[in-house]
Each structure stands twice: as structure tokens, then as C-alpha cells.
Amino acid sequence: MKKLYMIVDVQNDFVDGALGFEKAEDVVKQIVATLETKLEPEDVVVFTRDTHFENYLETQEGIRLPIPHCIHGTYGWEIVEALSPWIKTTTPIFDKPTFGSLELGNYLKTQNFDEIEIMGLVSNICVITNLPRLRKPHFRKLGLL
């Protein structure tokens, strides 16, 4: 059974940066524990990155949330170091300039996963907005951490 582990926006700015929050490090620890204990050789791990640019404050999101974060190429934009063991040169990483990722949706159309486990930060925005991209009739199970 082929399983996808989707890690959504686990970036420095959401842990200890501009939009960091107290429990973020606990979420990172749970994700690490899940990958260490559940990941099988046939499974796939993908990452998404919230991605903005220097003009962020001029964008629709920046006007509504005027806190620069996850600016492309900065420390805050990088995926947290704790997850680096699961990032290989072939690991799919989807940069998202908006809440969801069309590129991720297109990737999923080409794959045959039996299960998807989605984990990440800012669940009420970043994680949830990626769920519509996951609808495929053949998915047996969709887990949310």
C-alpha cells in the first residue's frame, strides 16, 4: 500500500519567526515522530512552502495580514531543520504563492496513493486549503495531524 505524507508549510516563520506560535514546536515533534515510526520504503513524502516575495505587503494577502513572512530565499521561508532528514534531491517541494497549490493538485493526478496523511502548521488556513486538491475517489484514507 502506497502512502503519501504531505507536510504543509512547516517553515521557520511559522515556528519561531514572524508568525510563530507557542505550540508549533510540539507539532514539529509530532511530525518527526510520525515519519520516524510510520514511513515505509514505498511511501512518499512531499512538502509545501508558503512562498511570498518582497512585494508581499502590496498583495491581497499582505493587505489583510500585514506581517511579512515566508519571503522567498530567507531563513523564515526554509523548511525547519528537524525535517531535513526527509528532504532529498528528488523530494517534491511545492512552493505556494497562494493558499492552495495547483502544482500539487497536478502532481497528485499523476500518482496512485492509497492513503494520504497531511500534517502541517496553521491548520485552519494552510493545511485546510490544500484538502480540495486531495479528492480522488480511490483514496482509501485521509489522515490529518
What positions do the PLM features span?
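Short, well-ordered secondary-structure micro-motifs
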Residues: 18, 57-59, 104-106, 129-130
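Histidine-anchored nucleotide/phosphate-binding helix
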Residues: 32-37, 128-139
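Short, glycine/serine-rich, charged loops/turns that create anion-binding
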Residues: 11-12, 52, 98, 123-125, ...
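Active-site acidic carboxylates
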Residues: 1-93, 143
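Short acidic/polar active-site loop segments enriched in Thr and Asp
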Residues: 43, 114, 140
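A short glycine-rich beta-strand->turn/loop micro-motif centered on a GG-aromatic cluster
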Residues: 117-121, 140-145
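Internal catalytic-core helix/loop-beta-alpha segment
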Residues: 73-127
